[in-house]
From Swiss-Prot:
NCBIfam families: galT_1, PRK11720.1. GO terms for cellular component: cytoplasm. InterPro entries: GalP_UDPtransf1, GalP_UDPtransf1_His-AS, GalP_Utransf_C, GalP_Utransf_N, HIT-like_sf. The modification Phosphoserine is found at S27. The gene is GAL7. UDP-alpha-D-glucose binds at A63, N79, D80, N169, Q184, K329, F330, L331, V332, F334, E335. The keyword Transmembrane does not apply. SUPFAM superfamilies: HIT-like. This is Galactose-1-phosphate uridylyltransferase. Its cofactor is Zn(2+). Homodimer. Its EC number is 2.7.7.12.
Length: 366
């Protein structure tokens, strides 16, 4: 087969992810195969405005006995079942007299920190695409305020906070244990592996090309258009060239902003707007409450000069659904043992999302 005959939309190929320094196998011809495997339960929008049994609804008692205030906007509280804690002893360093083989292979670090729950709305049955944009601005404001507060706690009170990972798991398909719209923030004294790898990649790219990786990538995607889903003055949303999940997207700041702490009011409103449009498109794709895991990647708290210089605010959305509201992608077999693989090309996925309404939610048309 000659190069002229190769078709990216039909033939297998590998794509490089410069953020993680890894490759993904793309097999577009597999999208036509029949599916007889597991199917997720289709989402039925039957949740009430208020659930007296919900641990996150205003005025309700949580499992620990703590009482929620009757909050009317976003509400943040320390996670009752935090993955990391402040009140634990520091692990001593390995004894240098121990077996060298053990020291080389069995490495361990103590990790302290704090975790928070971020209730997006007092309404039990509202997800991000169904909220008013003004409510989404409140969410963005809460992300910024939490980032600033944790940075100040580390700086002034010497709390062991180095990085805050803000994220949301939406839907039971993503392991969400409570359907009340909420996200989380885990603040650790170390930089998580995914973020650390990105920072290394950003640093390497800048040293080799004397510019920022995302500056070049935003320029490239704006020029090619084929992977762009939606954009506004401050942000561009793309299905990345190297996407693993079928309808994975990147929300990237068009200008270099290292952290949400640097956002002015206009940028915060633009982020709220782009998130609403993107998530409406997601829900409209299969006319379901589209599950995903999403999160912010930004500069570490009280970043060093190099960390600040290398960081560029962006958000990852990882939705599992593949071809319908009930058929999801699984990372198994070759993808666990070899490398990730996808069927639908990034360009095909972006076209589907781009052509969907990003203003009117499908439930408004019922």
């Amino acid at each position: 087969m000659t190069a002229e005959e190769f078709d990216f939309s039909s033939h297998s190929h590998r794509r490089y992810n410069p953020l993680t320094d890894s490759w993904i196998l793309v097999s577009p011809h597999r999208a036509k195969r029949p599916w007889l495997g597991q199917q997720e339960a289709a989402y039925k929008p039957t949740a009430p405005l208020y659930d007296p049994k919900c641990y996150l609804c205003p005025g309700n008692k949580r499992a620990t006995g703590n009482l929620n205030p009757r909050y009317e906007s976003t509400y943040i509280f320390p996670n009752d079942y935090a993955a990391v804690r402040l009140d634990q002893p520091i692990l001593p360093q390995n004894d240098s007299n121990e077996d060298n083989l053990k020291n080389r292979l069995l490495k361990v670090q103590s990790v302290r920190g704090n975790c928070f729950v971020i209730c997006f709305s007092p309404n039990h049955n509202l997800t991000i695409p169904q909220m008013k944009q003004s409510d989404l601005v409140h969410i963005v404001n809460s992300w910024q305020a939490l980032t600033d507060d944790l940075s100040r706690e580390a700086r002034e009170n010497h709390k062991p906070f180095k990085y805050v990972q803000i994220f949301e798991n939406k839907g039971t398909a993503m392991g969400c244990s409570n359907l009340h719209p909420h996200g989380q923030a885990w603040c650790l004294e170390s930089i998580p592996s995914e973020v650390s790898q990105e920072l290394k990649s950003f640093d390497k790219y800048k040293r080799e090309h004397n510019t920022d990786l995302f500056a070049d990538y935003v320029k490239l995607e704006s020029r090619e258009k084929s992977r762009v889903v939606v954009e506004n003055e401050s942000f561009i949303v793309v299905v990345p060239y190297w996407a693993i999940w079928p309808f994975e997207t990147l929300v990237i700041s068009k200008k270099k902003l290292a952290s949400i702490s640097q956002f002015n009011q206009m940028v915060k409103e633009d982020l709220a707007s782009i998130l609403k449009q993107l998530t409406i498109k997601y829900d409209n794709l299969f006319e379901t409450s589209f599950p995903y895991s999403m999160g912010i990647h930004q500069a570490p708290l009280n970043a060093t000069g190099d960390e600040l210089s290398n960081s560029w605010f962006h958000m990852h959305f990882y939705p599992p659904l593949l071809r319908s509201a009930t058929v999801r992608k699984f990372l198994v077999g070759f993808e666990l043992l070899g490398e990730p693989q996808r069927d639908l090309t990034s360009e095909q996925a972006a076209e589907k999302l781009r052509n969907l309404d990003g203003q009117i939610h499908y439930l408004q048309r019922l």
